[in-house]
Structure formats: C-alpha cells, structure tokens
Amino acid sequence: MSAANPETPNSTISREASTQSSSAAASQGWVLPEGKIVPNTVFVGGIDARMDETEIGSCFGRYGSVKEVKIITNRTGVSKGYGFVSFVNDVDVQKIVGSQIHFHGKKLKLGPAIRKQKLCARHVQPRPLVVNPPPPPQFQNVWRNPNTETYLQPQITPNPVTQHVQAYSAYPHSPGQVITGCQLLVYNYQEYPTYPDSAFQVTTGYQLPVYNYQPFPAYPRSPFQVTAGYQLPVYNYQAFPAYPNSPFQVATGYQFPVYNYQPFPAYPSSPFQVTAGYQLPVYNYQAFPAYPNSPFQVATGYQFPVYNYQAFPAYPNSPVQVTTGYQLPVYNYQAFPAYPNSPVQVTTGYQLPVYNYQAFPAYPSSPFQVTTGYQLPVYNYQAFPAYPSSPFQVTTGYQLPVYNYQAFPAYPSSPFQVTTGYQLPVYNYQAFPAYPSSPFQVTTGYQLPVYNYQAFPAYPSSPFQVTTGYQLPVYNYQAFPAYPSSPFQVTTGYQLPVYNYQAFPAYPNSAVQVTTGYQFHVYNYQMPPQCPVGEQRRNLWTEAYKWWYLVCLIQRRD
C-alpha cells in the first residue's frame, strides 16, 4: 500500500515523526491521517466532567514539565470529553501513548496530536496501515486552534481498511470554539448562542432525550455556583446564571423538552426585576405587558400551547410578599385573592401537565438564599425573586403534572427559610386561613387528585443543602395535620382515598430538619442515587422508559 508523498506541500510529515507515529500505530492499531505531528503534545480522550485541567496536568507531570492542558469545551463551558497536554521539554510521546493511565477510575484514551494544514482541511487522505488488533472503540476528534490549523485525533479502526477522516470546523462566530459531531439519542442537539444585545447573558443548553442521568458541573466563571442535578427522560436541562443588574439575585435551573428556548430581558420599570426564560413549542408566543394598576409591575413572556397565562403581582399590604406564576393547560385558571384577615397573604395559581419534579440546591453566594424545585415538561416555569420586606424570604415556582404537591413550613434549624405554594388541578380550590396560634402563619390550598407527593430531606454531606420533592404516580395523596411536638404548627387539608398513611420523622443528622408525610403503597421509597454507574444506570434507563411508556398510555386513554 502506498502512502502520500511526504514532500507534498500542505501534507507534510517529517520522516522522524512518521517513523515514530507508524511504530505507535502498529502497536495501537491506529490509521494515521496525513498531517504534521505536533511535538511534545499528547491527545487525551475519555475526560469526564469531574476532571479539571489542573488535575490532568498533575497526572501527566510524571512524564515531564507540563506546559499547558487544554480541555475542549462547548460554548456553555461543558467539557466535550477530550483535550490536549503539551510539555515544555522533549518527551517520549510514543512511550506516553503506549502507557495505561487511569484517572478517577476511568481509562484515558491517548494518542499523538496531529496538526492538519488549513489548505487540506476539506479532505484528508489517511495513511492506511494493515493490522489486526482486538477491536477497540472508535473515536475521532478535532480541535480548532487559534492559528487556523486543525488538530486531528487518529481514528481507531478494527479492520485493515482505509478510513477517511472528515474534519469538522468549529463555529467561527462562537466566543469559544465548539466541536460538533456529538450524537445525542433520538433527537438532534442544538446549542443556542448567548445574546450579545441582552443585558443578561444566557447560555442555553442541553437536549438530553429519552435516556440517562447526567450531572452537570458547577460553572467556575459564574458568580453563582450551580450544581445541577437531574435530567428527566425525554426533556432537557439548562441552568441560568444569576442576573447581576437585578436588585434581587435569582439563580434558577430548568428542564426543557424538545422545543426552542428564548430568554426574555428584565423589565427596568418594574420594582422587582424578573428575567424569565421559556420553551416555545408549536404554538404562538405572546408576551403580556405589565399591569399598570398593579403596585408591582410584572411583564412576563410565556409559551402556552393552547392555554392562557396570567401573572399576578405581589401584594403590598401583606407582611409576607409572594408572587407566583403558573401555567394551566386544558383547565381554566382562577387566581384567588389574598385574605385580608390573614397575617400572611397568599395568592396561588397552578399548572398541571404530566411529568416529574426536580429540586436544585441553594446558592451560597446569592444575597437571597433560595431552594427551588422545578419540573418542566411541555410547559413553562417562572421563578420570582425574594421579597426583602418579608420576614420569610420566599422564591416559589412549581409545575406539578397530574400529581400533587404538599408544602411544609419553614424549618427552624435550616439556614434557608422556605414557605411554598401549591398546585391544584381539575378539582376545586379551597384556601385555609392562617392559624393564629401558630408562630408562622400559613394559608394553604390543596387539590388532591389521584397521585402522590413526597419530600426528601436535605443531604448533610452535600456542600449544598437540598430539600427535594418527587412525585410518585398511580397512588393517592394525603396530608396530615401539624405535629404537636413541632415548633411550627401547620394544619392542612385532606384527601384520604384507598391507601395507608405513614409519617416519617425528621432526620436528626440532617442540617435541615424535615417532618414529612408520605403514602407509599406498592412501591418502595428510594433516595435518588448520586451519579449511578454500570448496571444501576442501565436499570434507571429501563425504569425511565417504563414510566414514560405508562404515562403515554394514560394520556392516550384519557
């Protein structure tokens, strides 16, 4: 088999580099593309989200003085899973490539770094090599360098056939170079750029269809560190940064399905600055102006397939200011006024589609600490800032599908005091007045259809304390009255069909004490795992698919 003439312009490989790389290729089973091997530089694949450049540099320090470590990321700062390590002095790249390096329990994929000249960027004729190694996985990576040259990672092939390497160009208009070619199951992946003309820069994000759980790392350049958590099958996750120009800092996290995203700017004439971002499928977009007769001006933009939206302002006469916004499919929306005789004024509205709930941790660097939980299938979410004149700082916003929500009083030992609102589908709404003998006045409203809600305590070993809530379909919900030994008395409303009740006490080792009531029929209680792996991850895929299939059947039957 013949190789390209090494003297050919724009496809030069030095004889020495060619000899070394051919030897490495013979041992590893690589088919090398034409190009120039970058001296003292190693391609590193298999980098997961937990690895940072400092750790990788330390790992490779055994081979020589590390000059630079570059992890390739997309526009949002999320690692693409590979990068390059360059050394100050001459190193034996062939020896490094042939070594076995495991990092965080994961084997790294190593190879020589190959620079492809610009004039040959459209077509690369590989140098064939006949080998018969055990079939390794295939991978191909490209790194766009500022000098307009392209680095090509050699492609692994299990058979002695000629492979053609297609170079993918990075996006020229991106503030950071992005490598495409990542295939996400079922749906296409789209990255949306930040909006340079917006007062608030938003990077949207991830469409992770049907399958696995992926945790997203905190964003080191963000003034608010976010550790996100849960990606619920079929839909997407995206985290929004806090808004520095807003008098109330809010960091929210959302999970969006299938459709497009548009961020809306804050409204400067509003005493409470709100920037909401929503997902707009199929239907038309309508933005509703602020209400001039309201003491608090709110302008929101939402995506509502088929249904209408109304946002309600805060109530100035209430000692605890709460503004909630919800999206109501199929059914009519009614907002109930605050109760003037109640020391705590609450107006709630609700929206009920069909899916799951997810909670995000509080943000320690925020002037207003917020523990929020959101679940957004086909519909929308909006979070409102805390209100400084309230004795209890509250940011609420929930979207609870066909299932139920129950709110618990503030937790005295918790660094974050939370008063939450409620979700009422199909059935009638009843608001219960505050209880004068309670040190914390709560007006609650409940609607209890056919399914369950449960809240989980914070995790004491987590740097971010999280009180999460999850939704358990098929069975019934019931709320029980306050616990007499609790310093905060709460009386709730009830719907007690069919099944048994069990109340679980607060967890004494938890930084946030929670007394919850649950009804668990047939199914077991599970705390959500941290980063499931192996067989456990495969089981989660299977369970997610079964639940999704069940929901589809229920919708079809309805």
UniProtKB/Swiss-Prot annotation:
Keywords of this entry: Cytoplasm, Developmental protein, Differentiation, Nucleus, Repeat, RNA-binding, Spermatogenesis
GO biological processes: 3'-UTR-mediated mRNA stabilization; cell differentiation; positive regulation of translational initiation; single fertilization; spermatogenesis
CDD domains in UniProt: RRM_DAZL
Bias (Polar residues): 1-10
Keyword Signal: no
Subcellular locations according to the entry: Cytoplasm; Nucleus
Gene3D superfamilies in the cross-refs: 3.30.70.330
Subunit structure: Forms a heterodimer with BOLL and DAZL. Interacts with PUM2, DAZAP1, DAZAP2, DZIP1 and DZIP3.
Stated family: Belongs to the RRM DAZ family.
UniProt remark on domains: The DAZ domains are essential and mediate the interaction with DAZAP1 and DAZAP2.
This protein's name: Deleted in azoospermia protein 2
Biological source species: Homo sapiens (Human)
Gene designation per UniProt: DAZ2
